[in-house]
């Protein structure tokens, strides 16, 4: 670890700016032969805006041998041994470093004598340094290094020391670089390559800041101090090379097929789509947007399976559905046809007119007729006295048409056909029944009365008499005699009173 303690050979024998010399005489004395040890405390300044390279060092060795200091003059014969020349150190650390560093010729001017040489000039006569110069000697001015150059040298030294300390701390024993929390999170979110590109861009921006700072302090007076840009194993990346996020257009991996669903049933359309970023999905029915409501739901599972759900399929849901997936890179579309089978409206059977009770004679034929309305058409059951009637026989037949009219025909009716007849109509919506009575009577045996004898009077004699007598009509038709005959036959007699 670097030690900021000042070595013994860095002890300054004379302060050119702040030292005060007491006049020579019996009360003054030269410096003691013992060297005085002092330390320089330099507070490192945090520089967040400037970063220097990992290899920038100060190659100038700040060394000075003890022989560079002149020997202390002999004590005056009449001087007090307890008195010494005192030097007041009121100089800043930067000025002190400038005083001990070897001078450098200015790049824009002629060579300036070193400060150390000017501070420790000796006279040709061997006059001590601390002795007061004679009045005849010409006083030479002491050149001073500008403060901004001294400050730049100090900052370069401090930054180089800080870099070395941080470099040791960031390297592991196996030589791999320790990742910071930000780098770990960036690798987890963006991937190793993208994270490296991000931090490399940051390093390049920091290198540019360092170069800008170095250009401002280009007039440093330390010739061997050279600032180099940090080199990384990932290579140089320009600031203009921004991270290019990749986009992938939507692509349907799984699509549903055309389907036919009964009205009132549950329906579900599943599909899968890929793309980066995740595409937005929308549905259209015959060009109209499908809105999510109580009967229509759009969901996405954890595995990326999209679904369009119909809780209850209605007739209005039939049509061509178009699914559109869209993101920044593009869009994709697929269509599916949904056919809805209309639900049949069912209606329970109902008698339009019912069969009537009838009474027939044995040997006759009879028809029991009714009309039933129902959707779908019902099944019919005929019973006689709670027993099923056997159809399709020579005597009994059942007829039914599309209008719902039903006819039960019974031929050659006998006594066994009499009783209560029940007709039942049954379908999916319900059932209905109706009862009727059939009575059969025996045919009666009738006796015919004997025919009445009629007496017929012949009339040939009259016509013969007429024909024989000619025109004598009175003789041919005797009214009195005829009247008496009719009266005798009818039982009428002529009253004597008349």
Curated annotation (Swiss-Prot):
<feature type="compositionally biased region" description="Polar residues">
    <location>
        <begin position="77"/>
        <end position="138"/>
    </location>
</feature>
<keyword id="KW-0947">Limb-girdle muscular dystrophy</keyword>
<dbReference type="InterPro" id="IPR036179">
    <property type="entry name" value="Ig-like_dom_sf"/>
</dbReference>
<dbReference type="GO" id="GO:0007156">
    <property type="term" value="P:homophilic cell adhesion via plasma membrane adhesion molecules"/>
</dbReference>
<comment type="similarity">
    <text>Belongs to the myotilin/palladin family.</text>
</comment>
<dbReference type="GO" id="GO:0015629">
    <property type="term" value="C:actin cytoskeleton"/>
</dbReference>
<feature type="compositionally biased region" description="Low complexity">
    <location>
        <begin position="202"/>
        <end position="212"/>
    </location>
</feature>
<feature type="domain" description="Ig-like C2-type 1">
    <location>
        <begin position="250"/>
        <end position="335"/>
    </location>
</feature>
<dbReference type="GO" id="GO:0008307">
    <property type="term" value="F:structural constituent of muscle"/>
</dbReference>
<keyword id="KW-0472">Membrane</keyword>
<feature type="region of interest" description="Necessary for interaction with ACTA1">
    <location>
        <begin position="215"/>
        <end position="498"/>
    </location>
</feature>
<dbReference type="GO" id="GO:0051393">
    <property type="term" value="F:alpha-actinin binding"/>
</dbReference>
<keyword id="KW-0488">Methylation</keyword>
<dbReference type="Pfam" id="PF07679">
    <property type="entry name" value="I-set"/>
</dbReference>
<dbReference type="InterPro" id="IPR003599">
    <property type="entry name" value="Ig_sub"/>
</dbReference>
<keyword id="KW-0206">Cytoskeleton</keyword>
<keyword id="KW-0009">Actin-binding</keyword>
<comment type="subunit">
    <text>Homodimer. Interacts with ACTA1, ACTN1, FLNA, FLNB, FLNC and MYOZ2. Interacts with the C-terminal region of MYOZ1.</text>
</comment>
<dbReference type="GO" id="GO:0008046">
    <property type="term" value="F:axon guidance receptor activity"/>
</dbReference>
<keyword id="KW-0677">Repeat</keyword>
<feature type="modified residue" description="Omega-N-methylarginine">
    <location>
        <position position="20"/>
    </location>
</feature>
<dbReference type="GO" id="GO:0003779">
    <property type="term" value="F:actin binding"/>
</dbReference>
<keyword id="KW-0225">Disease variant</keyword>
<feature type="compositionally biased region" description="Low complexity">
    <location>
        <begin position="29"/>
        <end position="43"/>
    </location>
</feature>
<feature type="region of interest" description="Disordered">
    <location>
        <begin position="64"/>
        <end position="151"/>
    </location>
</feature>
<feature type="region of interest" description="Necessary for interaction with ACTN1">
    <location>
        <begin position="79"/>
        <end position="150"/>
    </location>
</feature>
<dbReference type="InterPro" id="IPR013783">
    <property type="entry name" value="Ig-like_fold"/>
</dbReference>
<keyword id="KW-0393">Immunoglobulin domain</keyword>
<keyword id="KW-1003">Cell membrane</keyword>
<keyword id="KW-0963">Cytoplasm</keyword>
<protein>
    <recommendedName>
        <fullName>Myotilin</fullName>
    </recommendedName>
</protein>
<feature type="region of interest" description="Disordered">
    <location>
        <begin position="202"/>
        <end position="241"/>
    </location>
</feature>
<feature type="domain" description="Ig-like C2-type 2">
    <location>
        <begin position="349"/>
        <end position="441"/>
    </location>
</feature>
<dbReference type="InterPro" id="IPR003598">
    <property type="entry name" value="Ig_sub2"/>
</dbReference>
<feature type="region of interest" description="Disordered">
    <location>
        <begin position="1"/>
        <end position="46"/>
    </location>
</feature>
<dbReference type="GO" id="GO:0006936">
    <property type="term" value="P:muscle contraction"/>
</dbReference>
<keyword id="KW-0514">Muscle protein</keyword>
<dbReference type="GO" id="GO:0030424">
    <property type="term" value="C:axon"/>
</dbReference>
<dbReference type="GO" id="GO:0005886">
    <property type="term" value="C:plasma membrane"/>
</dbReference>
<comment type="function">
    <text>Component of a complex of multiple actin cross-linking proteins. Involved in the control of myofibril assembly and stability at the Z lines in muscle cells.</text>
</comment>
<keyword id="KW-1060">Myofibrillar myopathy</keyword>
<dbReference type="GO" id="GO:0050808">
    <property type="term" value="P:synapse organization"/>
</dbReference>
């Amino acid at each position: 670890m670097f030690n900021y303690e000042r070595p013994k050979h860095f002890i300054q024998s004379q302060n050119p700016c702040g030292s005060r010399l007491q006049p020579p005489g019996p009360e003054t004395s030269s410096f003691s032969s013992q060297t005085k040890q002092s330390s320089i405390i330099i507070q490192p300044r945090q520089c967040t805006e400037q970063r220097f390279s990992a290899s920038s060092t100060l190659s100038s060795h700040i060394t000075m041998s003890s022989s560079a200091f002149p020997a202390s003059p002999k004590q005056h014969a009449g001087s007090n041994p307890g008195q010494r020349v005192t030097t007041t150190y009121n100089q800043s650390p930067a000025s002190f470093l400038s005083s001990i560093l070897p001078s450098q010729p200015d790049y824009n001017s002629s060579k300036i004598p070193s400060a150390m040489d000017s501070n420790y000039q000796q006279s040709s006569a061997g006059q001590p340094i601390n002795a007061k110069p004679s009045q005849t000697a010409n006083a030479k001015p002491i050149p001073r290094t500008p403060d901004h150059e001294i400050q730049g040298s100090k900052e370069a030294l401090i930054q180089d020391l800080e870099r070395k300390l941080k470099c040791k701390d960031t390297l592991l024993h196996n030589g791999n670089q320790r990742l910071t929390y930000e780098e770990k999170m960036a690798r987890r979110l963006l991937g190793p390559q993208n994270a490296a590109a991000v931090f490399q861009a940051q390093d390049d921006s920091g290198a540019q800041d360092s170069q800008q700072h170095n250009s401002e302090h280009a007039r440093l007076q330390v010739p061997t101090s050279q600032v180099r840009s940090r080199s990384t194993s990932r290579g140089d990346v320009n600031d203009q090379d921004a991270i290019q996020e990749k986009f992938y257009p939507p692509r349907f991996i799984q699509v549903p097929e055309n389907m036919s669903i009964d009205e009132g049933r549950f329906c579900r359309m599943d599909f899968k789509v890929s793309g980066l970023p995740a595409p937005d999905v929308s549905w259209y029915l015959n060009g109209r947007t499908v809105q999510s409501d109580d009967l229509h739901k759009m969901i996405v599972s954890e595995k990326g399976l999209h679904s369009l759900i119909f809780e209850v399929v209605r007739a209005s849901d039939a049509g061509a559905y178009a699914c559109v997936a869209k993101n920044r890179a593009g869009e994709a579309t697929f269509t599916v046809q949904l056919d809805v089978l209309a639900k049949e409206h069912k209606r329970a059977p109902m008698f339009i007119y019912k069969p009537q009770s009838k009474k027939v004679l044995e040997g006759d034929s009879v028809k029991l007729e009714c009309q039933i309305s129902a959707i779908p058409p019902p099944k019919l059951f005929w019973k006689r006295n709670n027993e099923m009637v056997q159809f399709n026989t020579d005597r009994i037949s059942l007829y039914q048409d599309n209008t719902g009219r039903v006819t039960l025909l019974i031929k050659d009716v006998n006594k066994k056909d009499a009783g209560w007849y029940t007709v039942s109509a049954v379908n999916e919506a319900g059932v209905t029944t109706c009862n009727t009575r059939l009575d059969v009577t025996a045919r009666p045996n009738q006796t015919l009365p004997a025919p009445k004898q009629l007496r017929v009077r012949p009339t040939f004699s009259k016509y013969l008499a007429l024909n024989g007598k000619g025109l004598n009509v009175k003789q041919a038709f005797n009214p009195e005699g005829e009247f008496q005959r009719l009266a005798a036959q009818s039982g009428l007699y002529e009253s004597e009173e008349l």
